[in-house]
C-alpha cells in the first residue's frame, strides 16, 4: 500500500509563508506542538503502528526539482527560501508518538525542535491520522460524497445573487482521504465555475492549476508571545514582522489569537491601511463582521476596499447567509474545510495540533469560541487573559 502523503507540498500554503518568515527572522526559535482529539470515545491507539508507519513515509520525502520550480514561481517566495527547501526533509527525531498512559485509547503526539524544522509537520500528520482512522472504521462510499457535493453546489448555483461569492477549499487537515480530496477539487471547480477561487493545498493547486491560498495561522502570532517583545505588544510585533517580510503582499491578518477586542485594539490605522483584510476563525461571524466594518469606518477607511475572509466551520448554507448579510458592504471570501473534504457519512474527527511552547515558554491562543483555547500552563493562561483583558470563559 502506498503512503498517504506522497509530497511535502500536500499541505496548506500558509505553512510555507510562515516558514519563510521564520527562516529570515527567527531561524533559532525552538517550539513544541501537541496533538489533541476533541472527539470523545475515539480509540486511535489501536492504529498507532499504522500511524507510525505513515510518519516514516512522511519523513522520507523531500522536494523534487519540479516542486521547487513551482514554489519559485510564486511571487512571494524568495530564492533563498526555495533553495533551503531543496535541502529540507522532516526529521522523525523531533516527534514522539505513544499510546496515552492516562486515557485508554488515546494517543500522545508531541513535536519538539527548531520551529524552522518542525513547522511542516502539523497538516500532513492530521491528514494521516484522519485517513488511518477512516480507512479502518468506515467503508469509503464516493457516491455519497459526490451526491452531497452536488447538492451543495446546486444550493449556491440555483439561487441568483451569488455570482461574485468566492469559495475556496481549506480542507486538507480534516479530509476523509487523499483520494477523495483529489476527486473533489475538479468536481468543485467545475460545479462552482467562477465562484471557485482556489485551494489552500499547494500540491493540488500545482496539480490542477488552481490558485494556492493562505497567509498566516495562529501559531505565527502565538510564537511572538515568547519571541522577545513585551507580552502586551506581541501581536503588534507579529504583524509588523509579517509586514517586513512581505511588504504588503499576503495581507490577510488573523484576528482571534488573543480575542477580537485585543486584536482591534492593536489593529490601528497603520495596520488597517497596510493589510488587505482580516480572517475570522472563531466566535459569531456576523458579530465579528459588523465589528470589523465598524472598526474600519472609525479609521475613515471604506470597508468595501477590504476583504473579510470567513473560515470557521462553514457549510454552504452558512456561506450563503454570510454573503447575503455582508454583500456590498465589503469584499468577501469563504474558506470551506470539513464540509467539503469530509462529508461522506462518517462523523468527522475534531483533531488539532497546536503550538504550546516557544523558546521554553508557554504560548496560547485565546479564541473567540469557548473551549477552543489550548495551553499546558494554567498560570500562563490566566496571565495572558489578564494582560489582554480576556474573560475566563474562552
UniProtKB/Swiss-Prot annotation:
GO BP of this protein: NAD biosynthetic process via the salvage pathway
List of residues that carry Phosphohistidine: 218
EC assignment: 6.3.4.21
Broad enzyme group: ligase
Keywords: Ligase, Phosphoprotein, Pyridine nucleotide biosynthesis
NCBIfam families per UniProt: NAPRTase, PRK05321.1
PANTHER family referenced in this protein's UniProt entry, alphabetically: NICOTINATE PHOSPHORIBOSYLTRANSFERASE (PTHR11098:SF1)
Protein name: Nicotinate phosphoribosyltransferase
